[in-house]
Regions:
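A structural signal for short, hydrophobic/glycine-enriched beta-strand patches
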Residues: 1-166
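A conserved mid-domain beta-alpha-beta active-site/ligand-binding segment of alpha/beta enzyme cores
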Residues: 156-212
Length: 212
């Protein structure tokens, strides 16, 4: 797991929390994301929660209900009032998340000058790089469920992901850091040699199922 940990640590930023207008939970297979958003709501960091996601990579094989709707149900079970939740349930990838979410918030009359962007721990850096292309005028702090890589994998296995599938998704998202920057989907981020070597080792071991 050493190479997986190297990728995880590179992608995870661990920024300090700040007050925001709304927390935005980005859809995926990780059901700890709405729990983190609920925690931030109850701690008073943001008075509204927006969940963004239809069905996309991985979840289209797991669920029939949209990521946003599934996350909202989890947040409400954790005590977030329904009238404090905004849903964007049409997006199928990160770019659409970032294009559709500001429109949904504006339509709901929710100010979104400052947000807490909540994603998987290993998506924080990629989300930041994408946000600068698709939602550049928003001030954002990046957060995620406070879990280790092993705990993240264990939770993912509970909802139908496989251990290999999670590791492949981590590998695929690291690949997209460079690939998507070349395509203009996110700003470039320098990738250290240690991260490149860990990525290459995992690809050589067969973790290729989520490569673009």
């Amino acid at each position: 797991m050493e190479n997986v940990q190297i990728l995880w640590d590179f992608m995870h930023m661990g920024q300090a929390l700040e007050q925001a207008d709304v927390s935005v939970g980005f859809g995926c297979y990780d059901e700890d994301i709405p729990r983190r958003c609920a925690e931030l709501f109850h701690r008073g960091f943001a008075p509204y929660v927006c969940f963004s996601g239809g069905l996309g990579r991985n979840t289209d094989k797991l669920w029939t209900k949209s990521e946003a709707e599934r996350f909202a149900a989890i947040a409400m079970a954790a005590g977030v009032p329904e009238n404090r939740i905004i849903l964007e349930n049409k997006s199928t990838n990160s770019a659409e998340n970032l294009l559709f979410t500001p429109k949904v918030l504006a339509e709901a009359g929710v100010k979104a000058e400052r947000i807490i962007a909540v994603h998987k721990p290993y998506m924080e850096k990629r989300l930041l790089a994408s946000m600068q292309v698709y939602w550049p005028d928003v001030q954002a702090v990046y957060s995620s469920p406070q879990v280790s890589v092993e705990k993240h994998i264990a939770h993912a296995e509970q909802i139908g992901m496989t251990r290999k599938g999670v590791i492949e998704t981590i590998v695929g998202d690291v690949q997209r850091m460079e690939l998507y920057a070349q395509k203009g989907y996110q700003v470039p981020v320098e990738i250290p040699n240690q991260v490149r070597n860990a990525f290459d080792a995992l690809v050589a071991q067969g973790y290729t199922g989520q490569l673009a």
